[in-house]
């Protein structure tokens, strides 16, 4: 069974001075502003790379939780940050890398298990699979 999720974007104006809004069908994002200044100049609002990072961090955390459960483990906490790199490449811009930074507290997990299972989650996460970028993982087992 396929799952279909929807999001929409509205844009007005040219690239540098225009403004857009992003919404999701769940309403979690409702006309959230985005634009050139937020993307390239640190202005207010969100940007596509930040949203991809949030989606990737969330997807990875859920995938890791599932993989831990399959291995008979349960995390007390999983904290994931995604650093998304946008680079200028031939003919424009591309997301060239995503660095996932994981800190997790997992009672009973060995360092070897943690490394194996977190890498399995990195490879198996649906958002990882859709990105054509180098994805690295910095993982810390805490507690």
Residue map of PLM features:
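Extended beta-strand/beta-hairpin segments
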Residues: 1-54, 61-143
